[in-house]
Amino acid sequence: MLPVRWMSPESLSDGVFTNQSDVWSFGVLLWEILTLGAKPYPAKSNWEVLQYVRAGGRLERPSGAPERLHVIMSSCWCHVPDDRPSFKMCVQEIECLVESGNGASDMSDGYIRYDG
C-alpha cells in the first residue's frame, strides 16, 4: 500500500520519487503538524485523493496557521517539481519566520509555541 496522501503528482502518476517529491511530502507534514495530526484530505478516499491532486487540488490552509507558513506549504505543492523549493530554502524560510516572530499572533489557542 502506498502513502497516497503524502505523494506528489509525479509519484502518483509515474512512480517517480525525487528530492522534489520529498519536498511535496514535507509540505503535507507541515500541514499535519499545524492541524495537530489531522489526516490529510480527511473526507476523501485514496482514489479521490489521487484524482484530486492530479486535477490540481491542494490541502487548505489549516485554521490558525500563519499565512507565511501556508505560503511555504503551498510552494511545496507546485505541480511542476522544479518549481518547488529545496529543503534548504524551506528551512531558511521557516527559520526567518521563527526568528522574526511574525505570524505568532496568528496562532490560535491549542497550538504549541516552541521557543527552544
Residue ranges and their predicted role:
Residues 1-10:
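Conserved activation segment of eukaryotic-like protein kinases, specifically the C-terminal portion
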Residues 64-77:
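Conserved C-terminal C-lobe helix
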Residues 53-64:
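Short proline-rich PxxP-based motifs
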Residues 77-89:
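A conserved short helix/loop substructure at the end of the activation segment
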Residues 35-39, 80:
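Structural helix C-cap motif within protein kinase domains
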Residues 22:
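Conserved catalytic-loop aspartate of Hanks-type protein kinases
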Residues 14-19:
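Activation segment
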